[in-house]
Structure formats: structure tokens, C-alpha cells
Regions:
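Outer-membrane beta-barrel translocator/receptor signature
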Residues: 72-75, 86-164, 172-176, 227, ...
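Periplasmic plug
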Residues: 1, 8-11, 22-28, 41-83
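Outer-membrane beta-barrel "beta-signal"
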Residues: 463, 637-651
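Acidic/polar loop-and-plug regions of large Gram-negative outer-membrane beta-barrel proteins
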Residues: 148-152, 165-171, 175-236, 251-297, ...
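Face-selective signature of the C-terminal outer-membrane beta-barrel domain
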Residues: 230-252, 286-403
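Structural signature of Gram-negative outer-membrane beta-barrels, strongest in the C-terminal barrel
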Residues: 169-171, 297, 316-328, 366-484, ...
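Gram-negative outer-membrane beta-barrel transporters
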Residues: 384-386, 481, 510-588, 607-613, ...
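Membrane-embedded beta-barrel scaffold of Gram-negative outer-membrane proteins
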Residues: 234-236, 242-248, 252-258, 431, ...
Length: 651
């Protein structure tokens, strides 16, 4: 009954497609583009950056571009396309990615053990066990443990991933439910890249490196530790009136030592005069520097609401009132060597020694805090038997504080209205439409180092939804349009200068008014027969500013995703295709384009007995060479063909 495009990535689908990490998942979502830049990915949807996420429907503003949460801890992922400001507050009209945690739902001892072997010495083992903690099963526990080690197609790259997750769910009384849990993920990556390879030879033609080549050294690393804790209480107050209280805490620690090579700019110009590669010598001259940082980000969330159903005119209605609080704190200690312009790097032997200790000199502390509160009132009303109105309003306050007081800012009493209609014109078909407004403080800065004004606008969506084959197959068709002012647009080859006026590595942006994104989306999910599962989606959109200039050109305008599986007796055979249309960055001689491409994937599974399954997954079946990310005079290659063999034992 949500008047927007909705999709659920089930645990069965995640297992079948061998999707184990957050970054892997992003590449399979219709309408979502994820431009990779070293260990980080920057997802966009409908032409706008994805800037918030949800855990058990509680919003989080702490980014996940580098921490890459492991999906072993989650039961499913729920996706709501478009603006979702009523329930989340400040944010872009892109997509709400809701990570639903696993819970202890079984009153009997159950579990699953799995082990995987894959390309580039990829080994992982997972234990997932649920059990009653009391004789009647009213108190239950679940524990998930995972260990993974992996090399890579990239020279010198190694990764180790460790996950620990536990949750206790309790039915304290017939009217009181409580859940408490915590998780820890340690992700260590050595031999990492920071940025991409040069895109051009010195004669202006495009480079063509082996996909194994990266700019890195054996002393580089990128480590993250993520700690989460949460508590939920659901209390039935009287009749059908329910109180929900949610609290969550996240702590992200990051430590890096990195090597950077990029273009140099002459006399403050915007066109690089170095950073290319000589074809004859395979050497490049450009800007070389090292970097180290230690970052700690903590976040506290409180989400509480009361839902009260009632009857009016013989029809069922519901009102929800809630309050949300979110505060994130960030502390960063960083240092690095001065940028060395005119440095030479040999792309036949990139490994470069570390000139000195970069982790204990010239440390700077930049603490800051962002606080957001919001109160909302929403209702679902049946106006006539086939016609429902979903409407609400949210009032938000947002404040950013830095210890030095620089760029402190706040916005109070920002009102976000929402309205939607759902009309069930046949038993299995409905039409819907929705409207909401948008408010988002900008975290991008202009060339003077000043934060841009908040973006604002509105989003419209209308479409059809239908059920087929006795509800086993769902289809939806949506048309959407979003208009925004004060949208941040990167200024090509312009970076924010430091105190001496020299360019840093921080991209400079400008505000653009009249940005309009519009498009169409179709999705089909479910079972065609009892043996045949199908998931298909395709999205096309355009995004331009008031002058007709394309914005967010790093996002493919058309994306399509297909995954299907057919089961016969003990065998299951399936596969998928992920398609992305062309995307580009830069202009003129500095323009870099990734042409349209499609990646094919294959899976074959066999039930050895009723408890044991073997499954083979092959990604990039035809070994397509493509750019997973592009930037200023640089690009990042995607993974070549790779395979994983998994054994699962379930009891």
C-alpha cells in the first residue's frame, strides 16, 4: 500500500545470487548507479546521491561507502524508490535502503553452516544458529559468526573480513515484545588503491592497462571497525494501539595509509598539464603524495511512535505519531606528505617505498557534530472502499557544529509534507500517486571552502501495481519527476585550495537551480510457476538543470537487472544480467566515457540431501573488461570473471 516503487531483496535471492556485501548488492538494484573510487562506492538513484540508510527502519546518516557492511547479519533488504522525507527527515529523493536484521524467530534449535571457496584464494566460513533460551521459547537467541579472507585480481591486494552478530528476542508478556542485539565487523584491506589509473597517454589516446594494475604499494592499508548496538520495544497499550521505541548506536573507526598519484595543474589552471602516461616508457609525470588518517564516527538514534487504528464510517483508519532523534559525531586525525608535483612513476613497477612515517606527524583534529530531530504525524485513511489516502507532515530541526566554530549552521522548523493515493480499481490491480517536498543541507563546498545552501524541491510519482498467478507474481510500473534547486554540481578539474592557495584533493562544487529528474521504471518479481523464480527491472531517466545541461553524468541513464532461477528435483539453474548504459565525466579532451555494457552471471545448485546444498556462482561470465568507476583523468577497472563454490548445511 506504499504509493511509491517498492522492492524486497529476500534472503533466498541474496543467497542464490551470492550477494554477500553491501557494495555487491548496490550493483544489482534497478535504477541505482554505484561509481567505485578505490575502496569506496558512491551510489546514486534517479540522478541523486544516496545519502542515508536505514537499519530495521531506523534512519542512519553515517556513510557506508568504505565500511561495506556484510549482509550475513541481515535477513533481507527493503527498497523504497524516490523521496522518503516524512520518515527520514533531510535527504535526497533517491532511494531508501532499509537493512532488516536477522532475528531469533524460532522456538526450536535451528541453524546453518556454510563454507565457500572462490577465485583469488577467497575462503569464508559462516555459522548462523538460533535457539530458545527458555523452556517455553518466549526468550530466544541468535548468533552469527563469519570469517573471510580474500586476495584479488588487483596486484598485491588482500582482504580479511570478520563478523560477529548476536540478538535476543523476547515475548515478555502477551502485549510486550523486546529485542536487543549487537554486531561487530572488522574489515582489513592491504595493498589498496586511492583513486584510479591515469586515463590518457601523453598523445591524448586512452590508456589500456591490465586489470590487475593499480596505483598502490605494499605499505598501504584501509581498515575499518564497525560496532552496532540496538534495542527495540513494542508495547500494546490498549485495544489495537501500539507503542514502538527503538534505539540504535553505531561506531565506525577507520584507519588508512594511502598513496596518491594524479594530474598536476599549471598556474592554477583547470586543465592538467601532467598525469598522463608515456606510451614508449610506460612512465607518468604528475602529482604524488601520501596520506594517513584515523577517523572515529559515532551515531545515536532514537525512534519512537504510536500507531492507533480506529473505525470511521464503517471503514478502518490508522493514525501514526512519532518523534526521531539522530546525532552523529566525527573526529578525524590526519597527516600526509606535501604534494610532490612533477613526480615520475613507473607503471611497470608501481610499488614505491614510504619515504617517512606519515601516521604520527602533523596531526590535526577536526571534531564536528550533526544533530537532527523530527516530529511527524501521518495517517492512512480509507476514503471509499477502493480508495486510500496516505498523508502526513514532518517538522525537522538540523544543526551542524564544529569545534572551531567554522561553518557552523542550523535550520529549524523545516516542514516536509507528504500525500499519496492508492486506488484499487480491480481486485489485483491498483493505481497510486504521491507527492512530497524535499529539504537537504549540503555537505559540499564551493571553491572558497564555503558550504553550499540547502537544496529544496519536490517529488511526484504515479504508477500501477498488479498481482498475478494468485499473488505469486508482482509487477509495477512507475513514472516519476523530481525538481530541485541548490543542487551541488562538481566543477570539472577544480579543487578547493588550502591556506596557501594550492589545490587540495577536495572537489569544488557550485549550486545549480532548476534541476529536473524524470523517468520511468518497471519491475517484475515473484514466481512464474512453482519451479520458476523471476526478478526483472528496468529504469530510464533524464536529469538536467534549467539551462538543459545534463547533471550527474556518472550515473547510467538506463539500467536493467535480471535474475531468474529454475528448480527441478534436486537441481537449480539460474543466472542474471546487469546492464548499464553509457556514463561519462569531463568535457572536451578530458572527457572519459564508459560505453554501455552488460555483465552476465550464472548459478548452479544441487541438493546433496535434505540438509546439504552445493552451489556454484560465476560472475562476469564472458569476462567483460569495463570501468567500474571514472573520475578526473582516471578510471577504475571492474572485476574480471570469477567463481565461488559454496556448501551449506541447514538443520
Amino acid at each position: 500500500e506504499t504509493p511509491q516503487s517498492v522492492k524486497v531483496l529476500t534472503r533466498e535471492y541474496l543467497d542464490d545470487a551470492n550477494i554477500n556485501s553491501f557494495q555487491d548488492m548496490l550493483n544489482t538494484v534497478t535504477g541505482l548507479a554505484a561509481n567505485r573510487w578505490d575502496e569506496r562506492q558512491y551510489p546514486t538513484a534517479r540522478g541523486f546521491e544516496v545519502d542515508y540508510y536505514l537499519f530495521d527502519s531506523v534512519p542512519s546518516t553515517v556513510g557506508m561507502d568504505a565500511s561495506d557492511p556484510d549482509l550475513t547479519m541481515y535477513d533481507r533488504v527493503e527498497l523504497v524508490k524516490g523521496a522518503n522525507g516524512l520518515m527520514t527527515g533531510a535527504g535526497n529523493p533517491a532511494i531508501a535502503i532499509n537493512m532488516i536484521r536477522k532475528h531469533a524467530d524460532s522456538k526450536e534449535l535451528t541453524g546453518r553452516l556454510s563454507t565457500s571457496f572462490g577465485s583469488w584464494d577467497n575462503y569464508s566460513s559462516t555459522v548462523d544458529i538460533s535457539a530458545p533460551l527458555t523452556r517455553d521459547g518466549d526468550v530466544r537467541g541468535r548468533l552469527v559468526v563469519k570469517h573471510e579472507t580474500k586476495d584479488s585480481f588487483m596486484d598485491g591486494y588482500e582482504k580479511e573480513n570478520n563478523v560477529l552478530y548476536g540478538v535476543i528476542d523476547a515475548d515478555l508478556t502477551d502485549s510486550t515484545y523486546v529485542s536487543v542485539g549487537a554486531s561487530y565487523q572488522n574489515l582489513e584491506r592491504d595493498g589498496v588503491r586511492w583513486g584510479g589509473l591515469p586515463a590518457f597517454y601523453s598523445d591524448g589516446t586512452r590508456t589500456n592497462f591490465d586489470r590487475s594494475k593499480i596505483i598502490s604499494s605494499d605499505w598501504t592499508y584501509w581498515d575499518t571497525d564497525t560496532i552496532s548496538a540496538f534495542a527495540t520495544m513494542k508495547q500494546k497499550l490498549f485495544k489495537d494501539v501500539n507503542l514502538n521505541i527503538n534505539y540504535s548506536y553505531r561506531e565506525l573507526k577507520q584507519e588508512t595509509a594511502l598513496l596518491y598519484f594524479g594530474p598536476s595543474y599549471a598556474n592554477g589552471g583547470t586543465v592538467p598539464n601532467t598525469g598522463t602516461v608515456d606510451k614508449a616508457t610506460n612512465q607518468g609525470v604528475g602529482s604524488l603524495s601520501t596520506w594517513s588518517d584515523r577517523t572515529k564516527t559515532t551515531e545515536n538514534n532514537i525512534d519512537t511512535f504510536i500507531s492507533a487504528p480506529f473505525t470511521l464510517g464503517g471503514l478502518q483508519q490508522e493514525v501514526v505519531a512519532g518523534f526521531m532523534y539522530n546525532q552523529s559525531k566525527n573526529d578525524t586525525w590526519y597527516s600526509g606528505s606535501p604534494t610532490l608535483s612533477g613526480a615520475t612513476i613507473d607503471f611497470d613497477d608501481i610499488n614505491m617505498p614510504l619515504a617517512g612515517d606519515i601516521s604520527n606527524t602533523n596531526l590535526y583534529q577536526v571534531p564536528n557534530k550533526t544533530t537532527q530531530t523530527g516530529a511527524y504525524l501521518a495517517g492512512k485513511f480509507i476514503l471509499l472502499e477502493p480508495l486510500k489516502l496516505i498523508t502526513g507532515v514532518r517538522v525537522s530541526n538540523w544543526k551542524y557544529e564544529s569545534e572551531d566554530g567554522v561553518n557552523n549552521r542550523k535550520f529549524n522548523n523545516e516542514v516536509t509534507p507528504y500525500a499519496g493515493l492508492v486506488f484499487d480499481f480491480l481486485d489485483d490491480y491498483s493505481w497510486y500517486a504521491s507527492y512530497t517536498e524535499i529539504f537537504k543541507p549540503e555537505d559540499k563546498r564551493n571553491v572558497n571552502g564555503e558550504y553550499l545552501d540547502p537544496r529544496n524541491g519536490n517529488s511526484l510519482e504515479t504508477g500501477l501495481k498488479g498481482e498475478f498467478l494468485d499473488g505469486q507474481l508482482n509487477a509495477s510500473l512507475a513514472v516519476f519527476k523530481t525538481q530541485q534547486d541548490n543542487v551541488a554540481e562538481a566543477i570539472d578539474n577544480v579543487f578547493i585550495p588550502d591556506a596557501n592557495g594550492d589545490p587540495t584533493k577536495e572537489q569544488a562544487y557550485r549550486s545549480v537551480d532548476g534541476v529536473e529528474s524524470k523517468g520511468i521504471e518497471f519491475e517484475l518479481d515473484g514466481k512464474i510457476t512453482n519451479n520458476w523464480d523471476m526478478s526483472f527491472g528496468i529504469t530510464h531517466f533524464s536529469a538536467e538543470d534549467a539551462a538543459g545541461k545534463k547533471v550527474e553524468t556518472l550515473a547510467s541513464r538506463t539500467t536493467a537487472n535480471l535474475f531468474t532461477k529454475y528448480t527441478l528435483d534436486k537441481w537449480s539453474v539460474g543466472g542474471g544480467v546487469n546492464y548499464k548504459s553509457a556514463f561519462y565525466t569531463g568535457e572536451g579532451s578530458q572527457k572519459i566515457t564508459q560505453d554501455a555494457y552488460a555483465l552476465a552471471n550464472l548459478m548452479v545448485a544441487y541438493d546433496i540431501d535434505q540438509n546439504i546444498k552445493a552451489q556454484l556462482n560465476i560472475n562476469n561470465l564472458f569476462d567483460k573488461k569495463y570501468y567500474e568507476g571514472i573520475g578526473v583523468n582516471s578510471m577504475v577497472y571492474g572485476e574480471p570473471r570469477n567463481a565461488t563454490l559454496t556448501f551449506r548445511y541447514q538443520f
